Curated annotation (Swiss-Prot):
Active site: H14 (tele-phosphohistidine intermediate), E92 (proton donor/acceptor)
Documented EC number(s): 5.4.2.11
Organism, as annotated: Rhodococcus jostii (strain RHA1)
PROSITE patterns per record: PG_MUTASE
Gene giving rise to this polypeptide: gpmA
InterPro entries the UniProt entry points to: His_Pase_superF_clade-1, His_PPase_superfam, PG/BPGM_mutase_AS, Phosphogly_mut1
Protein name: 2,3-bisphosphoglycerate-dependent phosphoglycerate mutase
Biological role stated in the UniProt entry: Catalyzes the interconversion of 2-phosphoglycerate and 3-phosphoglycerate.
GO BP annotation list: gluconeogenesis; glycolytic process
SMART domains the record matches: PGAM (SM00855)
Length: 251
């Protein structure tokens, strides 16, 4: 596709991480993929190949689990050579003082209502993390150019940091007709899908994005989806994965 023709967007949530497997709030903590997560990255690359969906450029966060998933997927799809742009604005939502804590234990201590407010409400952030504490990123060198490193975020904060980056940077590649792969995180991708599909602040609470399954959006010249909600390359696995995400916090 050339010129101002429709771009193709592929969203990919990183494969299962070590803290996903342990049911811990992760946020900006930089954890590794599990063996399952590595396999999910490989399967994502196989799906890209099967659907002849070959990215021209990759955008990722600054976090290892997204970077590793993208590297595995692109290597599998023989697209390891494409240009890569990494940016903190694609990072997972910062979970504040909840980072490193077990979701089931937080739910048990604070109750279902407070747990769901922190986890899924649009504008209620968890308590801020203490600067300098074990799971804070305020001294992390990768964020040295930020005026202020977040100590907590709600989904609204992710929207505020991400959508200008989408409009100012990523959109140019799509408007040029490129196939753009964004490999990121549950909440940064939820923020972008909210924007693309015009999902309300209330309804976004019900959107769950599974790990490791590419989600395709075909966009018109105004970057509006021609296929609202996107199209998962493996719909059955995506439905099962989204249900598993929704159930996090259970014992």
């Amino acid at each position: 596709m050339n010129g101002m023709s429709t771009g193709t967007l592929v969203l990919l949530r990183h494969g299962e991480s070590e803290w996903n497997a342990l049911n811990l709030f992760t946020g900006w903590v930089d954890v590794h993929l599990t063996d399952k997560g590595i396999a999910e990255g490989k399967r994502a690359g196989e799906l890209l190949l099967e659907h002849n969906l070959l990215p021209d450029v990759l955008y990722t966060s600054l976090l290892r689990r997204a970077i590793s998933t993208a590297n595995i997927a692109l290597d599998t799809a023989d697209r390891h050579w494409i240009p890569v742009i990494r940016d903190w604005r694609l990072n997972e939502r910062h979970y504040g003082a909840l980072q490193g804590r077990n979701k089931a234990q937080v739910k048990e201590k604070y109750g279902d209502e407070q747990f769901m407010l922190w986890r899924r409400s649009y504008d209620t952030p968890p308590p801020p993390i203490e600067a300098g504490s074990e799971y804070s990123q305020d001294t992390d060198p990768r964020y040295a150019n930020l005026d202020k490193v977040p100590l907590t975020e709600c989904l609204k904060d992710v929207v505020v940091r991400l959508i200008p980056y989408w409009e100012d940077t990523i959109s140019a590649d799509l408007k040029a007709g490129k196939t753009v792969l964004i490999t990121a995180h549950g909440n940064s991708l939820r923020a972008l899908v909210k924007h693309l599909d015009g999902i309300s602040d209330e309804d976004i609470a019900g959107l769950n994005i599974p790990t490791g399954i590419p989600l395709r959006y075909d966009l018109d010249e105004n970057l509006k989806p021609l296929n609202p909600g996107g199209t998962y390359l493996d719909p059955e696995a995506a439905a099962a994965g989204a249900a598993a995400v929704a159930n996090q916090g259970g014992k």
